[in-house]
Regions:
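N-terminal secretory signal peptides
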Residues: 1-14, 25-30, 41
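Well-ordered alpha-helical scaffold segments within catalytic/enzyme domains
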Residues: 365-367, 402-413, 478-492, 509, ...
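Non-catalytic carbohydrate-binding regions of carbohydrate-active enzymes
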Residues: 485-490, 494-495, 506-516, 577-609, ...
Length: 806
């Protein structure tokens, strides 16, 4: 994609009155309580007992390193912390602790309602906008230069949500902890020591948009505020406290002298509000003042209180899933994370504990980036500058969907809510932009019928309802299907009622878009009339004006089915549901090409695109959809999907490999699914495809340049779970694609299964030993493994333990 698309204003901007009326109609102001998480005021829940793991516990869920990250390698080497809204990359240099702080709502741009000359949407940092950094915080301790210390070690403790570093200097053991507390809404850096040492140095706070930092000597704090040209206000603050030594402000720095301990507290945010009626801003919120209040309030509590509050809150989510994929060797365990990553690739030996750690790292990132605020964007809240690739936006043709495939599968259903709330809050503007701009005569994707209703999106979306780059007609269906799948896991009727306006509007859009076409039935040779999607592009290759692309046909089929079921469950719109049923019955469904043997991507027997293209758009009916199933679909259809997946290849990058792995798991090809996971675990060197030192997934865009894209960090763990358990409504299959590397023994607790169940599972020698199925709203399902089935009938909260699968 290009960073800039020159455009000329060609039509009036979106009607503010229209947006307000649409916002009121869908009740979007309820989507985050009308306030950003930054403005939340609920008092933190303080634990009454220590939540800390005992010494020696959690050793398999620690990433560790022998050197800090440098200022120019933060994105690849720094360790991430986050509280769901506020995130930071932490460098851990003993003498120069550096934190790159970002806020998920720190966006330039706006509604972006003036089309380019080709009828598509502008996609630049000023019109569409971009996520940007909030601040840099530096703690300088000059005496502790790296050359004067020994036994240096830094860790990311996934089980407790802590970044720690330790070293010895002049016989004194020094340690620091960094964490992002959701209850206190702050980032905390705690310095301690054993052996009579002390800290002397300074704390600095610097904005990234030329702000001026001010000091408040009365509160030993620093802060700044600013405003973008789009009217969004932002601010940040930092304070420091010690129970010994001296802490003062001098100029624009906090100065600490001979402190045996030190606590640095950081907060910040914007006046963003997930409310279209308010223009996505809270006019009464002063972010700089609120940041100052938050750091001053937090620092009044003891370091232990802040630590325990964070760890108890974090573990409440993280402990929902424990996983073992088998034992690693003592030699593997002795390696630091980077050496272990390299050894896994160089030696080719399975490292089950490390592979399980990678899955848990994905869960850590989800807890840290999707909680009570906006959903996870392309990089989450972890930036190393103000110009992230693709604006750090939301891509609607795989990326945002993949970000949430893991959540319900890995005991993180609560973290899905940010995605739901986002879609609801954007719906009024999405609807207005669709109805006022989509049928522009210059838009090559416009509806041939001339009619328009409902809503859709573009390939890129921002946080103001704005759309960017090209129109993406099928994007509405894929967003809705992802929202629906969350209902399948949770059986949450409140969620279903919330998303119903999205489903309804998407169906209305497709009712105006589908075209009648006459085709010849491959089996009977007779002609019949079918409904096909209007001109579209199969992401992101091939012709840009093809009708009936498989991608659209599959997604719309599922959308219609989900809308009908939602209407029945909620007792709504029976008449329109019947209309949708009629449309669904007439939809053209893709065929296998007699020429290539592949499932057709276009209504053509020819391959009109790139054989090994990264996207698997024509396979959405295999994953994430359920239409193509090895155990229930026609053999020719399954073979056609398998042949297409084979042709796409096994050598790609990040999210493309993750999607391939998920598809191979669905086809029960365990070793192919596993190999793609391992391919994503190859070390990224000089920007090459693979995992960076900090396990962020890197996509190589050119020689020596790689981009962090977070979706693979979620999609790859989702594939690992799909290898252990497959579910669809009424059906659970255990160990459908267990690779040889994990077959010796293993266990996992907390796997989500569709129809409202959670499964704990253990196995030995490739066979299920025991499975406990618990209802979280589901009633009946069938559990199968190795050709043996058990029918389960439970009430919510009940569980049953199943054996006898051998």
């Amino acid at each position: 994609m290009n960073d800039q698309h020159p455009h000329t204003p060609a039509q009036p901007s979106t009607s503010r009155r229209r947006v307000l009326s649409l916002a009121a109609a869908v009740g979007s102001f309820t989507a985050l309580g009308g306030l950003p998480a930054f403005a939340a005021t609920a008092p933190p829940k303080r634990p009454t007992t220590s939540p800390m793991l005992a010494e020696g516990q959690g050793s398999t869920t620690r990433m560790w390193y022998r050197a800090p990250a440098g200022e120019n390698t933060m994105l690849e080497r720094a360790l991430p912390v986050g509280n769901g809204r506020l995130g930071a990359l932490v460098g851990n240099d003993p003498s120069h602790e550096l934190l790159f702080v970002s806020d998920a709502t720190m966006w330039t741009g706006g509604i972006n309602d003036v089309l380019d000359q080709d009828g598509q949407l502008p996609y630049g940092r000023t019109d569409f906008g971009s996520l940007t950094q909030l601040a840099h915080v530096t703690v300088d301790i000059p005496e502790h230069d790296l050359g004067s210390v020994n036994s240096y070690r830094r860790e990311l403790d996934l089980a407790q949500g802590l970044v720690t570093s330790s070293y010895i200097r002049a016989g004194v053991s020094f340690e620091r902890r960094v964490f992002a507390s959701q209850p206190d809404d702050v980032i905390v850096v705690q310095f301690s020591q054993r052996g009579g040492g002390h800290y002397t140095g300074t704390v600095s706070l610097d904005g990234t948009h030329d702000e001026t930092t001010s000091a408040d000597g009365a509160h030993d704090s620093l802060s700044f505020g600013g405003q973008f040209t789009n009217g969004l206000r932002y601010g940040a603050a930092v304070t420091a406290h010690s129970m010994s030594g001296s802490v003062t402000t001098q100029g624009s720095k906090i100065v600490f002298t001979r402190c045996a301990d030190l606590t640095v507290v950081i907060s910040g945010g914007t006046n963003y509000s997930a409310d279209a009626q308010a223009g996505y801003r809270d006019p009464d919120l002063d972010p700089a003042a609120l940041a100052r209040t938050k750091v001053r309030t937090a620092v009044r509590h003891s370091p232990t209180t802040l630590l325990h509050t964070h760890v108890a809150d974090y573990r409440d989510q993280f402990d929902g899933m424990q996983i073992s994929l088998g034992p690693s060797t003592a030699e593997q365990r002795a390696l630091d994370t980077w050496e272990r990553l390299k050894a896994r690739t160089q030696q080719g030996e399975p490292d089950p504990e490390f592979e399980a750690l990678y899955l848990q790292f994905g869960r850590y990132l989800m807890i840290s980036s999707s909680r009570g605020s906006l959903p996870v964007a392309l990089q989450g809240p972890w930036l190393d500058g103000n110009d992230p690739d693709w604006m750090g936006d939301y891509h609607t043709d795989i990326n945002i969907q993949m970000n949430y495939w893991m959540a319900d599968r890995t005991a993180l259903s609560r973290n899905f809510d940010a995605f739901t709330d986002y879609c609801l809050s954007q719906l009024p503007v999405w609807t207005e932009l669709t109805q006022s701009l989509f049928n522009d005569p210059r838009n090559r994707f416009r509806n041939s019928s001339g009619k328009i209703a409902g809503w859709t999106v573009a390939y890129s979306t921002n946080i103001y309802g704005g759309l960017g780059w090209w129109w993406h007609p099928s994007g509405n269906a894929w967003l809705c299907n992802t929202l629906w799948e969350h209902y399948e896991y949770t059986q949450d009727r409140q969620h279903l009622a919330k998303i119903y306006p999205l489903l309804q509007g998407a169906c209305e859009f497709w009712e105006t878009r589908l075209l009648t076409m006459t085709v010849t039935d491959a089996d009977t040779g007779k002609e019949r009339e079918v409904l096909v999607a209007d001109k579209d592009w199969s992401p992101e290759h091939g012709p840009q004006d093809a009708r009936g692309i498989t991608y659209a046909q599959e997604l719309v089929r599922d959308l219609f089915a989900h809308y009908r079921e939602a209407s029945a469950l909620l007792g709504r719109n029976a008449a329109y549901s019947k209309t949708v049923a009629g449309l669904q019955e007439r939809l053209y469904m893709p065929e296998v090409s007699p020429k290539t043997g592949w499932l057709q991507e276009w209504m053509s027997p020819d391959n009109l695109g790139e054989t090994t293209h990264r996207h698997l758009s024509p396979l959405v009916g295999l994953f994430p959809g359920d239409r193509i199933r090895p155990d229930a679909s026609p053999a020719a259809l399954v073979k056609g999907a398998t042949e297409l997946l084979t042709a796409r290849g096994m050598e790609n990058f990040g999210w493309a490999n993750a999607w391939r792995s998920l598809c191979w798991a669905r086809l029960k090809h365990a070793e192919n699914a596993y190999q793609l996971v391992i391919t994503n675990l190859r070390p990224s060197v000089d920007g090459s495809n693979g995992s960076a030192m900090n396990l962020f997934d890197i996509y190589e865009t050119g020689k020596g340049r790689g981009i962090f894209q977070i979706e693979s960090n979620f999609g790859t763990p989702a594939a690992m779970i799909e290898m252990l358990l497959y579910s669809r409504p009424g059906h659970i299959e255990l160990l459908p694609a267990l690779p040889a590397a994990w077959a010796r023994s293993g266990s996992v607790t907390g796997i989500g299964a569709r129809s409202g169940f959670v499964v704990d599972l253990s196995w030995r020698d490739g066979k299920v030993r025991e499975a406990t199925v618990r209802s979280v709203g589901g009633r009946r399902t069938t559990v199968t493994a190795g050709g043996i089935s058990h029918d389960v009938d439970l009430r919510s909260g009940e569980s049953v333990t199943l054996r006898n699968f051998r």
